[in-house]
Amino acid sequence: IGTAEIYSQLEKVPEVLEGLVIGQIYDADTRIVLFVRLREGVELDTTLADRIRLTIRHGATPRHVPAVVLAVDDLPRTRSGKIAEIAVREIVHGRSVNNQSALANPEALALFENLPELA
């Protein structure tokens, strides 16, 4: 599936500043994991996570709905400002990221390491 459809639906959720989507190999399949950066003072609770999923389901398709939604404080970006999906996918799968020098904020990758929700 394309991530653009998910990102366009996130724009409809005012609490979400931006998001990052990856496919995680999980249980002999691939599941969608959505990381969101939220507005200041907003916490990701079950109600907000469910609303995010419902917004994506209605605006895209059921296949686009993330299995896991997690809040993070920062998203890694390339020096040109693009969100680094591939780098996050590698970290989540326990692999190293070789081109960290291409990232403007490589320290943000640590936010995605060894997350118990993704084990």
Regions found by a protein language model. Name each.
Residues L20-I25, V33-L34, R53-A119:
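Conserved C-terminal "lid"/linker of ANL adenylate-forming enzymes
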Residues Q24, L44-A49:
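Short, compositionally biased leader-like segments
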Residues E15, E43-D45, A84:
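Conserved beta-loop-beta connector loops within the AMP-binding
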Residues L10-G19:
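Short acidic amphipathic segments
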Residues I1-E11, F35-T46, A60-V68:
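Adenylate-forming
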